[in-house]
């Protein structure tokens, strides 16, 4: 089985509302699913190097295991840049969430190209929470949007309002996923919700991260 490519945000500021970054649990819980199954992972971020982290909770044993794992500690501290990646080495690309993604994922053409290439080569595209912001502008070789006509999921407008950041983020993800042609659905705030449409796997919130990993793993085993 080929590797899974994790993508983490490099953006560390939440407007004027303090720091942000990738959400630790949205990395650690899918990581645990893949690691326990013997799947190797690599990590990239738009700028490379050590990305900023949010949701830093080492009382979560999965977070703690990931944070201290000697191999993956090196990989998360020294993330590669998109240009360093050979797409054919990967069977899936996974976009972890965290509010930072809303600033540096949507318009990153290198990430769009990686996503398109992996998907059109038969690979899986996964994302959770704000991670699907990476997908709103991805176009396939035929010019159509990757998510057009597909069932998708991501952080809801209601959840953004609950955390009082609807006026801080550059756009509302739910609205943008719909505008890109996605068939968006959601559950009540903070409930696990995952949509699987062929080789596209998206989850609504941090609570959905493990289930997204499990859904990707199921597809990898087919």
Regions found by a protein language model. Name each.
Residues 1-121, 133-222:
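Extended, subdomain-level signal for the structured scaffold at the beginning of enzyme domains
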Residues 125-126:
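Conserved, well-structured core segments that form or line functional sites
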Residues 129:
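Alpha-helical segment proximal to the catalytic Tyr-Lys
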């Amino acid at each position: 089985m080929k590797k899974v490519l994790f993508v983490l945000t490099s953006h560390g500021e939440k407007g004027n509302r303090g720091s942000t970054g990738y959400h630790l649990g949205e990395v650690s819980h899918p990581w645990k699913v893949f690691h326990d199954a013997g799947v190797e992972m690599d990590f990239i971020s738009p700028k490379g190097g050590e990305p900023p982290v949010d949701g830093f909770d080492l009382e979560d044993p999965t977070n703690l295991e990931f944070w201290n794992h000697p191999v993956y500690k090196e990989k998360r501290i020294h993330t590669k840049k998109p240009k360093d990646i050979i797409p054919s080495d990967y069977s899936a690309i996974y976009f972890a969430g965290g509010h930072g993604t809303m600033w540096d994922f949507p318009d990153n053409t290198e990430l769009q190209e990686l996503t398109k290439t992996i998907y059109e080569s038969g690979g899986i595209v996964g994302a959770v929470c704000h991670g699907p912001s990476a997908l709103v502008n991805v176009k396939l070789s035929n010019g159509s949007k990757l998510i057009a006509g597909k069932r998708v999921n991501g952080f809801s407008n209601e959840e953004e309002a609950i955390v009082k950041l609807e006026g801080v983020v550059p756009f509302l993800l739910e609205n943008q996923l719909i505008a890109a042609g996605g068939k968006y659905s959601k559950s009540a705030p903070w409930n696990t919700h995952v949509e699987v449409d062929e080789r596209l796997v998206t989850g609504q919130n941090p609570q959905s991260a493990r289930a997204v990993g499990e859904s990707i793993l199921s597809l990898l085993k087919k």
